[in-house]
From Swiss-Prot:
Full protein name: dTTP/UTP pyrophosphatase
CC cofactor: a divalent metal cation
GO CC annotation: cytoplasm
Keyword Hydrolase: yes
Role, per record: Nucleoside triphosphate pyrophosphatase that hydrolyzes dTTP and UTP. May have a dual role in cell division arrest and in preventing the incorporation of modified nucleotides into cellular nucleic acids.
Gene Ontology terms: biological process: nucleotide metabolic process
Active site: D79 (proton acceptor)
Signal peptide: none
Species, as recorded: Nitrobacter hamburgensis (strain DSM 10229 / NCIMB 13809 / X14)
Amino acid sequence: MTGRLKLVLASGSPRRLSLLNQAGIDPDALRPADVDETPERGELPRACANRLARAKADATLKAVQLDDDLRGSFILAADTVVAVGRRILPKADLADEASQCLRLLSGRNHRVYTAVCLVTPKGNCRQRLIETRVRFKRLTEEDIRGYVGSGEWRGKAGGYAVQGIAGSFVVKLVGSYTNVVGLPLYESVSLLGGEGFPIRSGWLNAG
């Protein structure tokens, strides 16, 4: 590969893109992977996040290999799983799903896992799994109805977005906040930098 090193984000998530931009990294392309995100029967949360992040990276790699402009790019993929014990909560698409998630999370501890998978221009794969523990306040039915009415939960793991209204539900958070948003920033940037991606090239005049 010659010329400037490029980065493809294997996601269409505005949150993941915004987090990378916050760190001064602007991907050259967004290539969301079309992957079935249904957990396998009996699959544990950690294993599910790791499997899906790798599947997204592999699917995007195949697509990028057909693109002359992007072939040989770094590919960054991630998958976030919210779990209560061993139970994996859905990425809520329906109001009923979101309501069920919120009732389950109400007044309880849960864990958020994000697996990050980086494929280098040489085809090497590096993967990290980050865990954050979160506790919600006890939610009233008014809280739940109001939040579901906001629509903020759509497509979000566990049926909530911590960077929005649901941030006011959090009593305690132990670990990476950006992990709960959808991309553990420290670990993702460390992976990129460790594999030779110029993580500081976008810092000039960033302010």
